[in-house]
Amino acid sequence: MILQNKIPSIYHSIFPELLDIEFPEEQIATCDTCTLCRSPQSPYINTKCCTYQPTLVNFLLGGVFVDDDINLAIGKERIQSQIKSRAGVTPYGIIPSNAYIQREKQANSHDFWSRPHQLVESIRCPYSHKGLCTVWKYRENLCVTFFCSSIGGAAGKTFWKKVNTYLKMAETSLAQYAMLQLGWPPAKIKTDAVTAADFKFEEEDGIINDAKYAALWGDWIGREEEFYRSCFNIIKNIDASTFKQITGQTREILEAAITDTQKYFQLSNLPDFLLLHPDVVTDKSNENHALLVLGEITAEISSALLPLVYSFNGKRQTVEVFQLGYNVLFNMSELVEELREKGMLIKP
């Protein structure tokens, strides 16, 4: 698979150098058959991993409005509702509101697998509808690059983190460029990615300070949708040369980092089958924990995970064993990484 298949089409003419970079197909974490939904007890049964509000920058929002694709109709309506509420609505894009951030903090105060269903669903992405994304063609960086389990293990996660950083850099730089081209005062343009903390128009209780909101938007107040459309019309005509000029050395460094990490990703791809080393001895003397021993090398794991480890028998596909883990609300990524590094999981 190549990055062109993952990156939204709006970027294809802007940074074509990245499009042909190959990577192993992510077979464990797939959106259509979400691993987080395998167990009926999963708190994510109705949300998948979409317990996150993406920051849609100005030109991505404009893309949703300009595009006639029927699959974006619900997304348009939801963005229009956000604009009407004014919560999180800025010239840079629509960011998570203070109210959303507070709900997110409350959810994150619980362990990942033990979060209450109601709390998890309170932080469902506002663009999610019946398990599908209503703004998919114009999704943001994390929605392109997040995998709860990568087929490349730690190397895969490192690769996607670099791609994520690159896309976030592109979003931020292009959003600022669009504002500049539309006559926004340069001294008022923030040069970093923005968060709710950068603006003071929303109180902690969620009440919007209309005067501060009007001051933020200036002459564009009441024409937010038009502004976002204008941003998109600017960015859609940008070529690769202009993008390079805008992003400079930061882009060069990140492109090199993506190329470097891609090599390790390819080399670290999990085999289709894994086998627990025949010489591994299991010490079960502790009721709650088991000690896997291979010569002088040891690994301590929860006794409840032994059946999963034994499932690596050289006959069961690696992806299937990961699925068994999610069936009991356990992500096997770190454990598999550790056992492979210690030589306890090998190719049959």
Task: Cite the ranges covered by each PLM segment.
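Residue-level signal for threonine
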Residues: 57-60, 277-279, 302
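Secondary-structure transition/turn motif
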Residues: 136-139, 293-297
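C-terminal intrinsically disordered extensions
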Residues: 206-263
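Long, low-complexity, charged/polar intrinsically disordered regions in eukaryotic proteins
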Residues: 238-296
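Long, charge-rich, low-complexity alpha-helical segments
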Residues: 296-348
